[in-house]
Amino acid sequence: MSATAATVPPAAPAGEGGPPAPPPNLTSNRRLQQTQAQVDEVVDIMRVNVDKVLERDQKLSELDDRADALQAGASQFETSAAKLKRKYWWKNLKMMIILGVICAIILIIIIVYFST
C-alpha cells in the first residue's frame, strides 16, 4: 500500500449526499416516542374493549334474568292452563251426564205413556 492511499479520507456511503444524519440519540428518542404513542393508542383501544365487554356482560345478565322470569311465567301458565282444561272437561262431563239423564227420563215417560 502506498502512503497516499492511507491519507485519503474514505468515500461517503452511497445516497448520503444531503444533510448530516441526526445523532443516534435523537433517532432513538423519536422511535421511543412513536412506540409510546402506539402503546398509548393500544391501551386506549383495550380500555374501550373492556368497557364494551363489561356492558355486554351486564346486558347478558339482564337478558338471563328476563329469560328466567319468562320461563317461570310459562311454567305458571302451563299449570293454570292444565287446571282450566281439567275443570272444563269435568264441567262438560257433568253436562253430558245431565243431558243423558234427561233423555232417559223423557224416554221412560214416552215408553210408559204409550205402553198403557
From Swiss-Prot:
Indicate the segments forming the v-SNARE coiled-coil homology domain, all copies. 31-91
Instruction: Provide the topology term for how it sits in the membrane.
Output: Single-pass type IV membrane protein
Tell me the residue ranges located in the Cytoplasmic compartment per UniProt: 2-94
* Residue numbers spanned by region Required for interaction with SEPT8: 92-116
At what residues does the UniProt record annotate the site feature described as (Microbial infection) Cleavage? Answer: 58-60, 66-67, 76-77, 81-82
Looking up Gene3D superfamilies in the UniProt record yields: 1.20.5.110
Cite the entry's keywords alphabetically: Acetylation, Cell membrane, Coiled coil, Cytoplasmic vesicle, Membrane, Phosphoprotein, Synapse, Transmembrane, Transmembrane helix
Q: Which PROSITE patterns match?
A: SYNAPTOBREVIN, V_SNARE
**Tissue specificity:** Nervous system specific. A higher level expression is seen in the brain as compared to the spinal cord. Expressed in hippocampal neurons.
Query: SUPFAM superfamilies per the record?
Result: SNARE fusion complex
Region annotation (Disordered) ranges: 1-28
Residues with the modification N-acetylserine, per the entry, are 2
Family statement: Belongs to the synaptobrevin family.
What name does the UniProt record give this protein? Vesicle-associated membrane protein 2
Which gene does this sequence derive from?
Vamp2
